[in-house]
């Protein structure tokens, strides 16, 4: 939204003078909103003095409110930012901290957020710790933080294979969501798909720990299923919701910033560029900015609270673009040119995007991975080749510092470290044939589901 002329206010913090847009402070900070609307004598003065905050923390606050992305790495920088987010009641700064959680700072942020009463940051940091290695929880200093993390359940790697709607009279036990039980090294059944649901060429994504399925097809004519389906693991229930206005299949679905995005896709065998956004609270879809070009099945990923997709362009080019919510526009980020090779899968870790691309001459068995650092804009090729047996690399999902991939033979876990993906351990393969869509879900406590039965390949 366009702003009018700025009214600057001078703010003294930690012995330093800052000039800030008054409207920006009122919009994003509950403290200033209350202060300027109170009619107190201080609000009519030329200056506001904040004696309890640090200059560094307030500087970071202003940077975030203006849309910048300050690098907060040192402990004192993080602590000062948490203090400012809590005192100034600045949700945008709190979200920035949540989006930049790493295994290096999660324990510090969890303790600090607990001490300052920053509930959302505390909860997000606790979830991150729960999904990471056990040593992370040991770094917590506050007993209440350790107890909170101990009461949480880690996310489970889950998958669904390709299924079309089933006739009501024909029960198909293979039409299920499944999850990996890492302790027992077995895939277990989580829930049966609704009879009308199709995962063939569907968009699948999670948002708010719920699974959404949009745009599957039935039949050789690729008739689009009319409804979307949402699974809530906490209640073990499905509910239906409207499909996008533009019928589409092979769409990329992303849960981002509290909304669901259906990105591109295909209809009547023609790629489309339109993008729609679903508001779960309102229960309706609305169009947002089109992709720069028509595209189906585009890889997408989120890093640092930002949404990215890969597009293919002539001359062996994979282009990474970002959706800017504030301006409703797709912005170019970077391009990667490799002979006869394009990005087919993209995942995010910290401030980097990892693009998995085929080898030359349509070699999909031996893939390469390139890393785009968003802070520097530089590409780095991971050393060696990665075996992509039965498309396992295209099922990649990141949890903490670990990449999960799966096919019929095994589930492989990789540690992201030292500029590469190091094979960490091997688990059971998915026991059913077909292309897989994978995701993370946090499952409620209770008896584990039955071990998933094996279905023979046709």
Swiss-Prot record:
Chief localization: cytoplasm
Domain (BTB) ranges: 7-74
Free-text description of this protein's post-translational modifications in UniProt: Autoubiquitinated.
GO MF, one annotated term: actin filament binding
Pathway in which the depicted protein is active: Protein modification; protein ubiquitination
Keywords on record: Cytoplasm, Disease variant, Kelch repeat, Nemaline myopathy, Repeat, Ubl conjugation, Ubl conjugation pathway
InterPro entries: BTB/POZ_dom, Kelch-BTB_domain-containing, Kelch-typ_b-propeller, Kelch_1, SKP1/BTB/POZ_sf
Function of the molecule: Substrate-specific adapter of a BCR (BTB-CUL3-RBX1) E3 ubiquitin ligase complex.
Protein's UniProt keywords contain Cell membrane: no
The protein's name: Kelch repeat and BTB domain-containing protein 13
Domain of life: Eukaryota
Positions of disulphide bridges: none
Tissue/organ expression: Expressed in skeletal muscle.
GO cellular component: cytosol
Domain notes: The BCB domain mediates the interaction with CUL3.
Keyword Cell membrane: no
GO terms of biological process kind: actin filament organization; protein ubiquitination; regulation of the force of skeletal muscle contraction; relaxation of skeletal muscle
CDD domains: BACK_KBTBD13 (cd18486), BTB_POZ_KBTBD13 (cd18320)
Quaternary organization: Component of the BCR(KBTBD13) E3 ubiquitin ligase complex, at least composed of CUL3 and KBTBD13 and RBX1. Interacts with CUL3.
Taxonomic source organism: Homo sapiens
Kelch repeat placement: 159-209, 210-258, 259-305, 307-350, 352-400
Gene3D superfamilies: Kelch-type beta propeller, Potassium Channel Kv1.1, Chain A
Cellular localisation: Cytoplasm
Noted disease: Nemaline myopathy 6: A form of nemaline myopathy characterized by childhood onset of slowly progressive proximal muscle weakness, exercise intolerance, and slow movements with stiff muscles. Patients are unable to run or correct themselves from falling over.
């Amino acid at each position: 939204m366009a702003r009018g002329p700025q009214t600057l206010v001078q703010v003294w913090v930690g012995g330093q003078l800052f000039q800030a847009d008054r409207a920006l402070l009122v919009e994003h900070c509950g403290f200033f909103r209350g202060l300027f609307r109170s009619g107190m004598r201080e609000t009519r003065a030329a200056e506001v003095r904040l004696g309890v905050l640090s200059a560094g923390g307030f500087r970071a606050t202003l940077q975030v409110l203006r849309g910048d992305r300050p690098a907060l790495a040192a402990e004192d920088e993080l602590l000062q930012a948490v203090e400012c987010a809590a005192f100034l009641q600045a949700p945008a700064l709190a979200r920035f901290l949540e989006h930049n959680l790493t295994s290096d700072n999660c324990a510090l942020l969890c303790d600090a957020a607990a001490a300052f009463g920053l509930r959302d940051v505390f909860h997000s940091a606790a979830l991150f710790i729960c999904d990471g290695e056990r040593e992370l929880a040991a770094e917590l200093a506050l007993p209440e933080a350790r107890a909170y993390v101990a009461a949480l359940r880690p996310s489970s790697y889950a998958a669904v294979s390709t299924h079309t709607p089933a006739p009501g009279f024909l029960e198909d036990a293979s039409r299920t969501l499944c999850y990996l039980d890492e302790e027992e090294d077995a895939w277990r059944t989580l829930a049966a798909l609704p009879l009308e649901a199709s995962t063939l060429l569907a968009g699948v994504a999670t948002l708010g720990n719920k699974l959404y399925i949009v745009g599957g097809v039935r039949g050789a004519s690729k008739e689009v299923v009319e409804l979307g389906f949402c699974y809530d693991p906490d209640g073990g229930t499905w509910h239906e919701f409207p499909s996008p206005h533009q019928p589409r299949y092979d769409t990329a679905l992303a849960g981002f910033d509290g909304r669901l995005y259906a990105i591109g896709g295909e209809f009547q065998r023609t790629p489309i560029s339109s993008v729609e956004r679903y508001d779960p609270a309102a229960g309706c879809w609305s169009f947002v900015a089109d992709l720069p070009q028509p595209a189906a099945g585009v890889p997408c990923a989120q890093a640092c609270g930002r949404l990215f997709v890969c597009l293919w362009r002539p001359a062996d080019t994979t282009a990474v673009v970002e959706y800017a919510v504030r301006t409703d526009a797709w912005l170019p980020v970077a391009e990667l040119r490799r002979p006869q090779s394009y990005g087919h899968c993209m995942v995010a870790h910290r401030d980097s995007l990892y693009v998995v691309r085929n080898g030359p001459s349509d070699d999909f068995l031996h893939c390469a991975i390139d890393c785009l650092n968003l802070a520097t804009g530089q590409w780095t090729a991971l050393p060696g080749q990665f075996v992509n047996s039965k498309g396992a690399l295209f099922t990649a999902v990141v949890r903490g510092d670990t990449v999960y991939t799966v096919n019929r033979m095994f589930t492989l876990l990789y540690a992201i470290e030292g500029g590469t993906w190091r094979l960490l351990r091997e688990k059971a393969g998915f026991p059913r044939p077909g292309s897989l869509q994978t995701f993370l879900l946090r499952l409620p406590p209770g008896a584990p589901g039955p071990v998933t039965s094996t279905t023979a390949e046709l």
